[in-house]
């Protein structure tokens, strides 16, 4: 039966064309959301293929992606955990913007502690061989995909919230029920769109040179479903990249016009000027986050489009796998940038960590719940300008 071979994670996929050609007698369709081509069409005899995992370029790429995964586990794991803990403890942080940021934090935290260790084993330790079974293969693939879409949808929701708060300040702010519905929509849309990533993910035993076996973990689409695959990819590309980027760009362009190019009527007090400076800094930070998102993910989507719709471009490229690793590392680094911008910098995570540790240290083992609650209230975070900046009310 002809198959299409996808890769580990729809947002961190791989296509190892050098050893996929071992599927002799089959038409391999490879890609994050795979495309169709036959190795026989390009006269690539099996005995001329080499195991790219033993090359120097692959070794260098393995080191790079290993460093990226370690960085994600440390930055996203620790930073997002502290932010989520602080948000649970301090009520003054629970505004709409921070709740939307919490969606980013939760999704990136799950990827850092659940997916990254398995990917480290797959990419670096076992050099492109999966040893953890079909269920974990599909689960890791699915969680990575959901995390990407949650991040995209949350960034879009934050942009819309800033637009409404700054361009239409007299309109009532979003109620708790509406905010809960928005958060539910962010997750439900991401979960539904990512279902094919889990449904088509499976394991495939591949035999490379010298009869060495590699267990490939990724999406495998039947060749006769090529039209549906490409339609699905274009749908995802439009809904989870092009559409959100255009919408966020329009929102921040309108907000920037409001903050920088529109005269404020009346006499400007020091408090008004301080709030204006605060809003400008926050919007600049959000624009930087949007720019980082585009710079990190545009190469990945562009690489995927060329690979999936114009396979002849890469099929004989010697350093194709190394190029993919570079593109993938750039895309994965976006989660670290989000954590540093939203969690560590904007919310001063170290201050929250010190307060949480002090609270635990001061609470005696025999202390009552009432005294612990009093301790929590007395160590609450003051309404500083930094907190006002993130709230932007």
UniProtKB/Swiss-Prot annotation:
Residues 1-62, 120-146, 201-232, 304-322 are extracellular. Receptor for prokineticin 1. Exclusively coupled to the G(q) subclass of heteromeric G proteins. Activation leads to mobilization of calcium, stimulation of phosphoinositide turnover and activation of p44/p42 mitogen-activated protein kinase. May play a role during early pregnancy. The chain crosses the membrane at residues 63-83, 99-119, 147-167, 180-200, 233-253, 283-303, 323-343. It holds the Pfam family 7tm_1. Coiled coil: none annotated. The keyword tRNA processing does not apply. One of its GO terms (cellular component) is plasma membrane. This is Prokineticin receptor 1. It is a multi-pass membrane protein. The keyword Ligase does not apply. Glycans are attached at residue 11. Residues 84-98, 168-179, 254-282, 344-393 are cytoplasmic. It comes from the Eukaryota. It is found in: Cell membrane. GO terms for molecular function: G protein-coupled receptor activity; neuropeptide Y receptor activity. One of its GO terms (biological process) is negative regulation of apoptotic process. CDD domains: 7tmA_prokineticin-R. Belongs to the G-protein coupled receptor 1 family. Expressed at high levels in the heart, skeletal muscle and pancreas. Expressed at lower levels in the brain, lung, liver and kidney. Keywords: Cell membrane, Disulfide bond, G-protein coupled receptor, Glycoprotein, Membrane, Receptor, Transducer, Transmembrane, Transmembrane helix. InterPro entries: GPCR_Rhodpsn (IPR000276), GPCR_Rhodpsn_7TM (IPR017452), NPY_rcpt (IPR000611). Disulfide bonds join 137-217.
């Amino acid at each position: 039966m002809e198959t299409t071979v996808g890769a580990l994670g729809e947002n961190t996929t791989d296509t190892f064309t050098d050893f996929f050609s071992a599927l002799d007698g089959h038409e391999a369709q490879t890609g994050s959301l795979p495309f169709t081509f036959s190795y026989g069409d390009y006269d690539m005899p099996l005995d001329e293929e080499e195991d790219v995992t033993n090359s120097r370029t692959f070794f260098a790429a393995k080191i790079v992606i290993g460093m990226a995964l370690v960085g994600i586990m440390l930055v996203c794991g620790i930073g997002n955990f502290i932010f989520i803990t602080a948000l649970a403890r301090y009520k003054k942080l629970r505004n709409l913007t921070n709740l939307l940021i919490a969606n980013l934090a939760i999704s990136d935290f799950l990827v850092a502690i659940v997916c990254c260790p398995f990917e480290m084993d797959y990419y670096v330790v076992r050099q492109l061989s999966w040893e953890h079974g079909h269920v974990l293969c599909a689960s890791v693939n699915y969680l990575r995909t959901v995390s990407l879409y949650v991040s995209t949808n949350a960034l879009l929701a934050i942009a819309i919230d800033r637009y409404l708060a700054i361009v239409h300040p007299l309109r009532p702010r979003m109620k708790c029920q509406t905010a809960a519905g928005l958060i539910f929509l962010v997750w439900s849309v991401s979960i539904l769109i990512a279902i094919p990533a889990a449904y088509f993910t499976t394991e495939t035993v591949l035999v490379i040179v010298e009869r060495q076996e590699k267990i490939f973990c990724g999406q495998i689409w039947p060749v006769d479903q090529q039209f549906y695959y490409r339609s699905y990819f274009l749908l995802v590309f439009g809904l989870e990249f092009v559409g959100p980027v255009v919408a966020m760009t329009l929102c921040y362009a309108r907000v920037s016009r409001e903050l920088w190019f529109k005269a404020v009527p009346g006499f400007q007090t020091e408090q008004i000027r301080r709030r204006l400076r605060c809003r400008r800094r926050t919007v600049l930070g959000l624009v930087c986050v949007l720019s980082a998102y585009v710079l990190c993910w545009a190469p990945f989507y562009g690489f995927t489009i060329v690979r999936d719709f114009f396979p002849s471009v890469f099929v004989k490229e010697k350093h194709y796998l190394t190029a993919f690793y570079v593109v993938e590392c750039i895309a994965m680094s976006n989660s670290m940038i989000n954590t540093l911008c939203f969690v560590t910098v904007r919310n001063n995570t170290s201050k929250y960590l010190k307060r949480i540790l002090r609270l635990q240290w001061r609470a005696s083992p025999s202390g009552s719940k009432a005294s612990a609650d009093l301790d929590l209230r007395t160590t609450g975070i003051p309404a500083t300008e930094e907190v006002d900046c993130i709230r932007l009310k």
